[in-house]
Amino acid sequence: MAKLVVIHGQSEPQELIVGEGAVLGRSPECDLVIGGPLVSRRHVRIFRDGDGYSIEDLGSANGTVVNGSDMTRAALRDGDWITVGDCQLTFLLDDAYTPPQSALLLDDSMPTVVDVVDLGARAAGAETLDATLAGKLKARLDVLRAVSERACGALEIGRLVELALDELLRVYRQADHAHAVLMGFGEGHDDLRLSVTRAGRPRDAAGMSRTLLGIATADKKAVLAGDVSADDRLEAAQSIVSRSLRSTMCSPLLMGSRVLGAIQVDTMEPDEPFSRDDLELLVAIAGQIAVAAENSRLHREVVAQQRLAAVGQAVSSLAHCIKNVLNGLQGGSYIVDLGLRDEDNDRIVKGWDIVKRNAGFMSEMVKDMLAYCRKTAVRREPTDLRGLLNETLLMVQETAAQKGVETALVVDGEPPPAAVDATGIKRAVLNLLTNAVEACSEGCSVEVDLAADPGADSVCITVRDDGPGMAPEVRAHVFDAFFTTKGSKGTGLGLALVQKVVEEHKGDLRLDSEPGQGSAFHIWLPADLPRQQASGP
Amino acid sequence: MTDASGKKILVVDDEPDAVEFVRAVMEEAGHRVVSASGGDEGLAKARAESPDLIVLDVQMPGKDGFTTFAELRRDAQLASIPVVMLTGVGEKLGIGFSAEDMGDFIGEEPEAYVEKPVDPARLAGTVAELLGG
């Protein structure tokens, strides 16, 4: 039976038995309804195709991705990853998802190399085995717990696998080396190969045995060579014999029926070959590592997608703003052309004003963009904030007066000079004031307050207006880069920039706003110099 | 001048410079222009002025072009006025925004779309075609 499971994203239901076929898309008539602006109404279908299943994009606007590649039609295999818009799904051929350790079977009838469980060696040490049985069981539980705890905590896969290999050397006291191969998990999708060697033992530069890796990954079988030297069937496995290994075992890393790689443990110690119990524990640990590896891969994918989405959002927002400015420039020059043709001076002036205004807007936009992206250390110097605020207020006063909006600067007491980056704070306050004036209509007022808090050594700048205020859904996103309520006039960078400046000062930014009640932005800034700068030259 | 000249055009855009641009293009084609700076004002002007055609910007603060268009179509007095939508919305959302998708949002489609930045000849041609038909 085939099943689709939603791993990430909005959809209903969260799981779907595919049966003969299923259509995925935004339309409520689809078998699996997926939300989001990137999803077409009928986006993609999955259908029975001979003995298996196939997937076909239904001409969606934004395409379908299977295992990281765009496709129009493809055969589906168990464990395949499907991306539709922001939604991530996995395709499973068995409805009963089986964890890797129980999915794995030891195959005693394996014809080549190593199905050898060396019972003779174990019988010889029978009395010690009984005596250490409880200890062994406890060690197993310990190692499983340790690996699964680390599997939950560490998302960097290389580090996680190293920890797990160390754990293997701890639990298999006779082991000299532990190796892991994770296919496609390395840089540039190369295989990730890691090995650890017990302190004081010879290093094994060759890494994992290719013979064992082949059996583990191609046949999905766990492999045990109890006593390599005693087994004449191992002649083919030169890589094992030539390294003086006496006993070795290997388990695939399985996620469902997908092979992610394999782990191997070996010993050069002739008296302590690995047992079938040891192999079973290795299989269980392999299961934990596989889950962790898969988590790490998913995490990496989500981060990459979020990064791409953020870049896409930035580029499209900027493109939109630039288009609006271009529209203004084009409009202005069109009007200038008409004026020149008709020798109509008023028209020329009118068109030219439009050109200048839009060039100015573009210039402000570029300044905001650069200020938002710049990663320079702020230079805080004692600054007369009253003077700075007065200057900044003057910059918006003309626009405010034209709209019939009153402006005022209110200073509480005699605030001491504060150590701020004057350019950054001026830009931040100017953005807040510009927003406030734009939000206000005739008869409203905009006020800047400056108050010092001597007890806490901080100053507070408040930009307050009695304009329309903000709805909760606007308030929630108001500091997000590229979020704007100004239609074509906004870049969505103004408030994001204010937040950045305040964070650079290790200050605090808060917003009070309710619909119909106006808005107040409070900027708290530490008044004193940061220690490293104060003690500097 | 064709038969389509001398009509009354309502331009709805929050950006005064964009209004002036469209006004210049329309006046050049011999039309008269009334303007509104937002969706609500646009609806009121449409009722008061009974324009022959409406040029409507999509991206406006407050009542956006989609909502304004949907309300125009719901109003029996206004539903038959042809609408040219000025759009850069596909770029804004970063997706291929088709007419079908637009239909999804507002149930109906405007008579024509013109992309910003506006090409004066294309806007004039589109309006002439709609008014001359």
Predicted regions and their residues:
Chain B
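Non-catalytic signal-transmission and effector/linker regions of two-component phosphorelay proteins
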Residues: 1-8, 115, 119-133
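Conserved sequence signature across two-component system core domains
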Residues: 12-13, 36, 54
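Charged docking surfaces used in two-component/phosphorelay signaling
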Residues: 20-28
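Receiver (REC) domain active-site loop signature in two-component systems and cognate sites
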Residues: 60
